[in-house]
């Protein structure tokens, strides 16, 4: 079932300052990867219990997007820049974010601390990150690709984006005019999820982000793996997503997505990412990975120093940021010897910002399409929305377990939670719903 989108601002009527600018060059300089060789995405996973998909749905017309200026380079962590306050908003729901509702009480998970946080014992004193209080501007990029007419066509990805946009607007205060939606059932060429449009939209999402802004990216489509070319992956493979034109333009590698959307972010900016695709466990290359028990696992932080952090202590999962695995001390000392903060950030894939990602499966797993509520859906997208509709105020640990409980017994995939910094798993997870703060 496919919906006709009638809301202004889904893929058009954006404010003038949001400009796409010129198309990116065909060959990207660093930090973009050269995807000279790539493999087609696999077919639908065997867990998909439905008949072959029908033909393409009727085309939907979307008004052309407003002009989007080409995003200027954002300052990297450690470089000098003049802080600017978050932009003022005239929208009622944004004005109300500055006063916490009394309903946030004893039975609700605590909000994250607002002071600057240290990465842990052994880290340089200036190596810090900042949680977001999510009182600033809200922007969302939603990408759904059914690969209409292609051999490995999917059924639920466009529905995922339709449902996610409604959910974010109605429950979390994201305005339609602050969303960019890319789906392959649109007539407007700027709203087609080809590689160039996806990369431009990712740049738009993070452009001019200020402390306490809430950015959101959702991808539903094919994902895969490709041999790692820069030696930063423990298993020797990079995670990739497949744009609509992957056969001619190539895939998009996790290194590139990290460089575009994570590396430029300033302290206190929240980026929430949902990747509902195969092999998406570390699609943003975030170093901290958590289990349903809240225990830090499989950290990539010490790879460059040839250290083992697999025995990282449970304090991260319990919200104790005062300590870190003892084995990390030597690595951080090495990073402090003459390296700039930016170099350390690039090397470790950490960030001073507040970046959290839920992915549909581990790096080695496939994700399933499902049929829920009378329509085809991505399993993670469906479970994410359902659990937060039933219980909006959950901690990270509760939300991860809720999603897994929805999927358990129906699918073999295990969703993952990863972060750019040590995460207090008992803290409140997402930005407050409008009903809690209006």
UniProtKB/Swiss-Prot annotation:
Write down the EC number: 3.4.22.-
> Where is there biased composition of kind Low complexity?
29-38
Residue ranges that the Swiss-Prot or TrEMBL entry lists as coiled coil: none
| Compositional bias segments (type: Pro residues) | 39-74
Q: Which GO molecular function annotation, any one, does this entry have?
A: cysteine-type endopeptidase activity
Question: Can you list the GO cellular component terms from the UniProt entry?
Answer: cytoplasm
**Into which family does the record put it?**
Belongs to the peptidase C14B family.
UniProt keyword annotation of Plastid present: no
Q: Which SUPFAM superfamilies match?
A: Caspase-like
Q: What class of enzyme is it?
A: hydrolase
Q: Which gene encodes it?
A: casB
Which residues act catalytically here? Answer: 222, 278
Keywords, A to Z, come to: Apoptosis, Hydrolase, Protease, Thiol protease, Zymogen
Q: What does this protein do?
A: Involved in cell death (apoptosis).
Q: Which domain of life is it from?
A: Eukaryota
- Does the record bear Mitochondrion in its keywords? no
Picking any one GO biological process from the record gives: apoptotic process
The record ties this protein, via Gene3D superfamilies, to: 3.40.50.12660
The protein in question is named Metacaspase-1B
Q: Where is this region: Disordered?
A: 1-125
């Amino acid at each position: 079932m496919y919906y006709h989108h009638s809301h202004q601002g889904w893929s058009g009527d954006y404010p003038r300052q949001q400009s796409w600018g010129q198309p990116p060059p065909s060959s990207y300089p660093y930090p973009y990867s050269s995807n000279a060789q790539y493999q087609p995405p696999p077919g639908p996973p065997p867990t998909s219990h439905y008949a072959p998909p029908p033909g393409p749905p009727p085309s939907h017309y979307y008004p052309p997007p407003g002009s989007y200026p080409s995003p200027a380079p954002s300052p990297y962590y450690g470089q000098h820049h003049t802080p600017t306050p978050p932009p003022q908003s005239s929208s009622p729901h944004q004005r109300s974010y500055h006063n916490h509702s009394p309903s946030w009480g004893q039975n609700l998970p605590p909000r994250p601390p607002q002071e600057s946080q240290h990465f842990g014992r052994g880290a340089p004193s200036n190596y810090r990150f900042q949680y977001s209080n999510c009182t600033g501007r809200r922007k969302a990029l939603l990408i759904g690709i059914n690969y209409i007419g292609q051999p490995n066509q999917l059924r639920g990805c466009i529905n995922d984006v339709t449902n996610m946009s409604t959910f974010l607007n109605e429950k979390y205060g994201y305005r339609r005019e602050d969303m960019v939606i890319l789906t392959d059932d649109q007539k407007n060429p700027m709203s087609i999820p080809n590689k160039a449009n996806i990369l431009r939209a990712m740049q738009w999402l993070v452009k001019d982000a200020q402390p306490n802004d809430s950015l959101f990216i959702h991808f539903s489509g094919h994902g895969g793996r490709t041999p790692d070319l820069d030696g930063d992956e423990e298993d020797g493979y990079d995670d990739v997503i497949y744009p609509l034109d992957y056969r001619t333009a190539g895939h998009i590698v996790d290194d590139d997505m990290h460089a575009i959307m994570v590396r430029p972010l300033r302290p206190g900016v929240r980026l929430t990412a949902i990747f509902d695709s195969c092999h998406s466990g570390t699609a943003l290359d975030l170093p901290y990975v958590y289990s349903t028990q809240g225990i830090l696992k499989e950290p990539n932080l010490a790879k460059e120093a040839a250290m083992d952090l697999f025995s990282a202590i449970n304090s991260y999962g319990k919200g104790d940021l005062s300590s870190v695995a003892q084995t990390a001390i030597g690595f951080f000392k090495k990073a402090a010897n003459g390296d700039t903060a930016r170099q350390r950030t690039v090397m470790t894939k950490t960030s001073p910002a507040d970046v959290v990602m839920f992915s549909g499966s581990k790096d080695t797993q496939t994700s399933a399409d499902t049929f829920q509520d009378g329509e085809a859906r991505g399993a993670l997208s469906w479970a994410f929305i359902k659990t937060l509709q039933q219980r909006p105020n959950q901690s990270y640990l509760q939300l991860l377990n809720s999603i897994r409980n929805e999927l358990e017994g129906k699918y073999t995939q295990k969703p993952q939670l990863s972060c750019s910094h040590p995460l207090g798993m008992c803290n409140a997870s997402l930005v407050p719903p409008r009903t809690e703060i209006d």
